């Protein structure tokens, strides 16, 4: 006589509870379509309807690279050693050249091995810095108006956004008196961007020194997003050149 097999733990197929539907992570619930993506679609619709929209939004070059640049890229692409994986921190020659560039234009000495990280774009940098410094609920100071990525990445990592106003009557610079009156408890990071997008306002050594002093006073990381330093600017400036070190301790301000 055939023995009856014991029932499998968990019951039969008919009695197993239904597996819940897979849902996205909570961190993406507040993520919206990127600002410029929405605007470019809007511009495309306007152009299709006959409007001639002049796009002053994204800082995309409207001129091609120089012939010498294109030739150098073609020569590099033809080399057999340029098509594999690169080091995760960039090749040493590239980082060393970045360090020489900072010394030449800003008078800043940087350690290529520990203070330079090549990235594929500013968004990657904003994400890396936010992930490195911001826990859920930490405060981050974001300029208004300002680069939309600061806010979108801050929302993604669950940070608490504290906008600070840039006003024309103040030359589009932070109002430090207003900042000092804010509740800065829990604030760990402050984004600034000069030459500024979207106002076009330029920075100054005096402004950067105020930002450095503000960051040190409140133990806030100041991150200077500096992609427009050489656009219509006779005196390119980096916040790193304004650091006044009082000891050989590690750098206490993050910038570019």
Please annotate each region the language model reported:
Residues 39, 43, 150, 211, ...:
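Aromatic/hydrophobic pocket-lining residues that form π-stacking "cages" and hydrophobic walls in ligand
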Residues 6-8, 13-25, 29-121, 128:
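N-terminal small-domain helix-loop-helix segment of the aminotransferase-like
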Residues 156-161:
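A short helix-loop-beta submotif of the ANL/AMP-binding
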Residues 109-116, 136-139, 186, 247:
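Short acidic capping loops at alpha-helix termini that bridge into adjacent secondary structure
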Residues 245-256:
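Single conserved hydrophobic/aromatic residue that forms the stacking wall/gate
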Residues 162, 166-234:
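Active-site phosphate-binding strand-loop segment of PLP-dependent enzymes
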Residues 132-154:
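Conserved PLP-anchoring active-site segment centered on the Schiff-base-forming lysine
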